[in-house]
């Protein structure tokens, strides 16, 4: 039986706009198993990114519970929540958010450096992961010297360098051309299978979503089978 890495129940989020409460998520139930790959699709503005932020402990739900490796991140102090996030999760976004003044290997090593891993070890582990994503020849290059696909591969390396239990990816290929998007998506699936890391991807691309183990659609604030 697959263990559950990430779970939420009755998850809801309401935003205040002027004097009106606007519910974005109503009652979301989800369980992500070890090494499972899951795609969440839905219309623009349906709340996909909001859901990912709640699952990652980056935003606070209005109601409901989240459990990451059996721990409720919202019952922890801010420092404890950051530690849990940094050890258990990796994040990939549509825009790479790489630090322009640092090289590819330094960017990929950043989560380890934040965890106070010795710099030499952090860089060695980052170089190993960059090799796995086909960027051995780009270690010393800064983001401005890389193509869009290469920058996104560095972002993926940064997400997996800590060997997280789960990767949360928000439109990771949305800013790439079709061929590059295909390559990046295949890379994420390969790392998912080889490392046994769970993968939750928010995407508008139904073709890419179909290549995941499971697909769900966010409609009217709830998840449905796609």
Curated annotation (Swiss-Prot):
An MF annotation (GO) of this entry: ATP hydrolysis activity
Signal peptide location: none
Major enzyme class: translocase
Annotated ATP binding sites: 42-49
Membrane topology, record value: Peripheral membrane protein
Enzyme Commission no: 7.6.2.-
Family, per entry: Belongs to the ABC transporter superfamily. Lipoprotein translocase (TC 3.A.1.125) family.
PANTHER family: IMPORT ATP-BINDING PROTEIN, LIPOPROTEIN-RELEASING SYSTEM ATP-BINDING PROTEIN LOLD
The protein's assembly and partners: The complex is composed of two ATP-binding proteins (LolD) and two transmembrane proteins (LolC and LolE).
Role description: Part of the ABC transporter complex LolCDE involved in the translocation of mature outer membrane-directed lipoproteins, from the inner membrane to the periplasmic chaperone, LolA. Responsible for the formation of the LolA-lipoprotein complex in an ATP-dependent manner.
Name the record gives this protein: Lipoprotein-releasing system ATP-binding protein LolD
Underlying gene: lolD
